[in-house]
C-alpha cells in the first residue's frame, strides 16, 4: 500500500486540473497579451480564474495578482511594502515561527536594507502572543506579517484579532497573511478580517506547482519587485502562466466545493490518527489538536528515534511523511518552530509531520498506525543511548 501523508509539502493535482492544464498548453496556448483569437482565448482563462478567486475571497478582481507561488507572493508583500513605505518607518513585525519565505526575507531586510524586525514569541501551542504584538507596535511600524496556519504544527493564528490590534494602533500599517496552508481549509475573507495582503500557492490545493497569487487591497501602497512588459497593471511583469492560472482557478473552485464536508473528513481522520498514535509510549503531539487547530496537520514527537531514521523506515513501507517544512528539509536542522513552542529537547530531532488531504482514507491511517506500532519499538530497541 502507498500512503501519502505529506500534503502540507505538496498535493496530488485534481484530475480536472491536470486536464485543463494540458488543454491550455496544447490547444489554447496563446499569449494573453496578443490581440488575435489565440490571445483572446488565453486571456479568457486568466479572467475566469480571477473571477473564481475573487468570489471565494469576496474581493475585487483587480486586487488579485498571479505569481510563481507562495514564496514570490510573500516576497512581493514584504519587499514591495518596505520599499513603498520606508519613509513612514522601517520597523516590521512577524512571528518567530513563520515559513522561511517570510523569515529569510525579513532577515534580508534587516541585514541589507537597515530595517528593524520584531519577531513575536508564541505560546506552547504555536499561537502568537497578542500582548507581545501590542507592545511591539510603534510609530515606525509599517508592516505586520502573520501566517494563517503554521506549516509544521498546524496552529491557527488569531488573524482577525491581530489585525484589529494593528489597525487600532495605526490604520496605515499593512497587515499581511501567508495563507498557503490555510487557503482551501478555511473560508478566508480579507475585507472582513482586516487583511491587506494575502499569499496563496497553487500546489497546496491540488493545483499546479509554479503558480500562486497575492491579494493586495486596492488602497495598499506596494511597489513591484519584477519589471518588464507591464503585465498585471505593472505589479507583476512577465507573460502570464496561463496553464498554471487556469489550473489554480479550477483547483480553488473544486476545493471550495463542499469544503465543510472535506474538512470534516480530514478532522475525523486526524482525531482517529491521534487517538491511535497516543497508544505508543513516549510520544507527544505538538500544538493543539482540537477544533481550533488545522484539520490536516499532525506533528508527532517520538522520543529516542531520529526523525530521519523513522521517516525512511516508513518510506520503506510505502508511507510518505515529512520531518518538518519540506521547503527546508533538504537542509536538516533543528526546527525553529519546535524550539519556539518550547518542545522538549528529546523531541527536537525526533518529530515527524503527518498531513492529510481529502483523498486520505481511514484504511491508510490504520495502515500507518499499524506500521508505527511495529517499527517504533524496534527502532528504539536498536537506538544507541
Predicted segment positions?
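Pyridoxal 5′-phosphate
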Residues: 1-385
